[in-house]
Amino acid sequence: VTWCRGAAYYTESGWRGSLKTEGGGVLINQSVHTQDLLCFLLGDPTTVDATMTNHHLKDVIEVEDTLEAYIDFNGVHASFYATTSYCADVAPLIEIACENMTIRVEDPHVTVYPKDAAPYQLSVETLPPIGKSYWGTGHTACISDFYQSLRDNRRFSLNLETMEPSIRLMLGTYESARSGHSVTLIEQ
C-alpha cells in the first residue's frame, strides 16, 4: 500500500495522526483492509515480525507513516509493506507467488502469470468504487453484500468471528513493531 498523505491531511482533522485518537497510523487507517485480504486469501496468520517508523512527518504526527511485516500463515509467508510517504496514491497491490504461477491483484484487475505460458487477466465482476479510485471496490462490494444479506434474510458474511484473524494480525503487527520481536498469533 503506497499512498501520499501530507501534513494537511493530519492537521485539518481532529483525530488523525494521534495515537490516542486514531490508535495508530498507516496500518490501522490506510492498509488494514489489505491485511484483511491477506487473511481471506491465505488463512489464519500464525506469526508476525514487523517494524514501523515515521519518515516524513516527524513534527506533525506521532504515529507510523511506514510499516513493514513478515507474516507466516501456517507455512505460507507474506511480506507486507504500507506507507503514506509515497509521492502518489496507488491502488494496493497483492502478489501471490505459487509454484507454477504468480497471481497479481491490483483492484479491480487480477492477472495470472503462469510459469510456462502467456499471462492472462481473470474476469472479475466489480461495482463502481465509493470514494477515490485507489480505495478500490472492496467497500462497495461489502456494502452491497450487507444489503443483499438483509434482503435474503441471511447472516452477513463478515462478523467478529470471520474478522478475528485480521484483528489478531493487526494487533500482533503493532505489538511486534513496538517490542522489536516476532509475535506468535496462534499456536501451531
Question: Model-found features: residue ranges?
Answer:
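Predominantly a Rossmann-like dinucleotide-binding segment in NAD(P)-dependent oxidoreductases
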Residues: V1-V60, G180
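C-terminal helix-to-coil terminal segments
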Residues: W15, H139, I143-Q148
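Active-site rim elements
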Residues: G23-G25, I130-Y134, D152-F156
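A generic structural signal for residues located within well-ordered alpha-helices
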Residues: Q30-H33, G138, L158-E161, P165
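A general structural signal for well-ordered alpha-helical segments in protein cores
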Residues: T34-Q35, T140-S144, M170-L171
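NAD(P)-dinucleotide binding in Rossmann-like oxidoreductases
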Residues: L57-E64, F73-A141, N159, E187
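C-terminal helix-rich "cap/oligomerization" subdomain common to oxidoreductases
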Residues: Y147-Q188
